[in-house]
């Protein structure tokens, strides 16, 4: 019959197109789909494509007023996941016109919006995204990037060192600033606000900013090195967040910080633009990420959240440690660390990378390894992450038996020893303990640190693992 035909039709008739050849401008997504019993994979894959682009559950007459072929998502390949019954990777291509330029928020609202509550799927996880250069060019990305940061700080050829000030809640501003000063004076490059330090009754943000700035200037004067403190500008409103960033700029400090998932991508991108315009570096904390990324069969993989952050903007981001107390398997972690730092990353399923990603010269982001690490981990961290990283030791600095400054000294000595050994061609993986032991002979601070933490290990299997290939 001619004209509009009402009724429900199968998704796969419109949205499953195995013959489709992807375009260079398409955004490509890899979803891990677990269909409900009785739902064929083609129907499930097509449903993902439909519900995250143009589709609705029934035919509507306004479909006739547009060109579905131009705007619809297409499921173009489905492959079973090895070792899993009834789980598939569905590849979906989205036309570029379906997204607003320069908006991570809009990209996520489409791709990971309502579709995650869809009844025909038992579970759904976004494993990876291929962002085309045409879309990347609409983002400003990190305010400065790795090279500019090194030039600003005048620090080359080694990872940077930081320390989160603990206890995270309850210190007064003056005592907090004192802890910052001691760590910076001892040899760290940065100290850091904890992610949940914003502006609470025991320490309002303005007081904290002032005392931390004092600590920075005092430590700089005494060490001759450039120092910084990640001043957390995260706030309840965007206006308040920018107000805090403005005050940081007026104090002349080098870096501010934001919790990008709890604060949201819109706020984060606004802050990144402000930081670029005003010469502030931007440190990003990923609080709430595990809510989204920890389950293997549902949610969004962190490599996607990391790509989104590079688009939205940030100069540092926490990225797991491989060796500390928080989640992170080595190959997977190194996969998204490369996605953060490098300009071109080849598809590599052994590291969980589903697509080749070309960043077309968008600046890189420094990965921050933090969480349960201490001096004995330094050889492994130096070997795994290389020079372009920040290693943040909170308890691993402040927990030193002699105090904060000696804790900082121990970290700096162990780092310099590892970098020196590596530059001399020694194998950090094999000789790490020996390198630290040698250095501790002439550094009593390091020897004391080794004595305290020599037996500490967080040995649990990672929850998020690679599929058997």
Curated annotation (Swiss-Prot):
GO terms for molecular function: magnesium ion binding; monooxygenase activity; ribulose-bisphosphate carboxylase activity. This is Ribulose bisphosphate carboxylase large chain. The disulfide bond which can form in the large chain dimeric partners within the hexadecamer appears to be associated with oxidative stress and protein turnover. One of its GO terms (biological process) is photorespiration. It comes from Calycophyllum candidissimum (Degame lemonwood tree). Its EC number is 4.1.1.39. The keyword Plastid applies. Keywords: Calvin cycle, Carbon dioxide fixation, Chloroplast, Disulfide bond, Lyase, Magnesium, Metal-binding, Methylation, Monooxygenase, Oxidoreductase, Photorespiration, Photosynthesis, Plastid. The modification N6-carboxylysine is found at residue 192. The basic functional RuBisCO is composed of a large chain homodimer in a 'head-to-tail' conformation. In form I RuBisCO this homodimer is arranged in a barrel-like tetramer with the small subunits forming a tetrameric 'cap' on each end of the 'barrel'. Substrate binds at residues 114, 164, 168, 286, 318, 370. Binds 1 Mg(2+) ion per subunit.
């Amino acid at each position: 019959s001619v004209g509009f035909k009402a009724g429900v039709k199968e998704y796969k008739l419109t949205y499953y197109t195995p013959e489709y050849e992807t375009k260079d401008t398409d955004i490509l997504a890899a979803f891990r789909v677990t269909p409900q019993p009785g739902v064929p994979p083609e129907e499930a894959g097509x449903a993902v494509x439909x519900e995250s682009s143009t589709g609705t559950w029934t035919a509507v007459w306004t479909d006739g007023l547009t060109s579905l072929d131009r705007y619809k998502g297409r499921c173009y390949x489905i492959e079973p996941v090895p070792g899993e019954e009834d789980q598939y990777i569905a590849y979906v291509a989205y036309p570029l016109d379906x997204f607003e330029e320069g908006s991570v928020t809009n990209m996520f609202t489409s791709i990971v919006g309502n579709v995650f509550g869809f009844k025909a799927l038992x579970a759904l996880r976004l494993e990876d995204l291929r962002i085309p250069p045409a879309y990347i060019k609409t983002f400003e990305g990190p305010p400065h990037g790795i090279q500019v940061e090194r030039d600003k700080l005048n620090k080359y050829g080694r990872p940077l060192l930081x320390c989160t000030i603990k206890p995270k809640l309850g210190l007064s501003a003056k005592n907090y600033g004192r802890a910052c000063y001691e760590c910076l004076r001892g040899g760290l490059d940065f100290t850091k606000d904890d992610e949940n330090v914003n502006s609470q009754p025991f320490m309002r943000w303005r007081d904290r900013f002032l005392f931390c700035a004092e600590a920075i200037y005092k430590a700089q004067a005494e060490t001759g090195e450039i120092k910084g403190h990640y001043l957390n500008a995260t706030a309840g409103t965007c206006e308040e967040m920018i107000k805090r960033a403005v005050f940081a700029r007026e104090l002349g400090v080098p870096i501010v910080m934001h919790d990008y998932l709890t604060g949201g991508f819109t706020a984060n991108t606004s802050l990144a633009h402000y930081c670029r315009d005003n010469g502030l570096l931007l440190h990003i904390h990923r609080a709430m990420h595990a809510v989204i990324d920890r389950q293997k069969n549902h949610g969004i993989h962190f490599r996607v959240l990391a790509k989104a952050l590079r688009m939205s903007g940030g100069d540092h981001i926490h990225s797991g440690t491989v060796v500390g107390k928080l989640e992170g398997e080595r190959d997977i972690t190194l996969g998204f660390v490369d996605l953060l730092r490098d300009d071109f990353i080849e598809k590599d399923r052994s590291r969980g990378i589903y697509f080749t990603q070309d960043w077309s010269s968008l600046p890189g982001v420094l990965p921050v390894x933090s969480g349960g690490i201490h001096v004995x981990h330094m050889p492994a961290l130096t070997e795994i992450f290389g020079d372009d990283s920040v290693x943040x030791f909170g308890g691993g600095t402040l927990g030193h038996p002699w105090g904060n400054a000696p804790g900082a000294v121990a970290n700096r000595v162990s780092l310099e020893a590892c970098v020196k050994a590596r530059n001399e061609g020694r194998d950090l993986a094999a000789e790490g303990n020996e390198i630290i032991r040698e250095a501790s002979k002439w550094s009593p601070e390091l020897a004391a640190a080794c004595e305290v933490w020599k037996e500490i290990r967080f040995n649990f299997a990672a929850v998020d693992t690679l599929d058997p290939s």
